[in-house]
């Protein structure tokens, strides 16, 4: 699976994996998978991570007992998630649906509601955090093209 990633992406995955491999045994706790993937800028929830992990370990890429995963399994999961990620243009087009006035601005509450009820659903807390990032002045509105840039730069 890693073959579909650029060398830069593989290097970034290695860097993140090594940060979480605190005892340097070549494995990270499966429970840290969500946090590690989010460190790569990937929006992933616990259920999705469990599915990815089950697929990776079933195909021989991980599980050494104790719920730990090796770099190959992590890279497999990261590659799968990264390939599913949307581009800036695709994200902007999705948010454009909420912009009836075609002003480039959408209500922050509408964005929050969309994040907790559609697609890869966020928790209320995660959605609140994203809205705070998107609307740092607390004006109740989000310039969605800038929000997309924030999302894409989290990688």
Curated annotation (Swiss-Prot):
Role of this protein: Potential calcium sensor.
GO cellular component labels: cytoplasm
Binding site for Ca(2+): 21, 23, 25, 27, 32
Source organism: Oryza sativa subsp. japonica
Protein name: Probable calcium-binding protein CML9
CDD domains, A to Z: EFh (cd00051)
GO molecular function, one term: enzyme regulator activity
Keyword Glycosyltransferase: no
Keyword Oxidoreductase: no
Keyword field: Calcium, Metal-binding, Repeat
A Pfam family recorded for this sequence: EF-hand_6
Annotated SMART domains: EFh (SM00054)
Domain EF-hand: 8-43, 86-121, 122-155
Signal peptide: none
GN (gene name): CML9
């Amino acid at each position: 699976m890693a073959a579909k990633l650029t060398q830069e992406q593989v290097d970034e995955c290695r860097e993140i994996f090594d940060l979480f491999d605190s005892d340097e045994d070549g494995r990270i706790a499966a429970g840290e998978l969500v946090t590690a993937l989010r460190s790569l800028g990937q929006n992933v929830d616990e259920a999705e991570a469990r599915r990815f992990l089950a697929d990776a370990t079933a195909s021989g890429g991980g599980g050494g007992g104790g719920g730990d995963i090796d770099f190959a399994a992590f890279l497999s999961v990261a590659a799968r998630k990264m390939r599913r990620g949307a581009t800036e243009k695709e994200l902007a087009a999705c948010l454009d649906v909420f912009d009836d006035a075609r002003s480039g601005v959408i209500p922050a509450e509408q964005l929050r509601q969309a994040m907790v009820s559609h697609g890869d659903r966020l928790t209320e807390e995660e959605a609140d955090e994203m809205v705070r990032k998107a609307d740092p002045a607390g004006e109740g509105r989000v310039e969605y093209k800038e929000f997309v840039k924030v999302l894409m730069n989290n990688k």
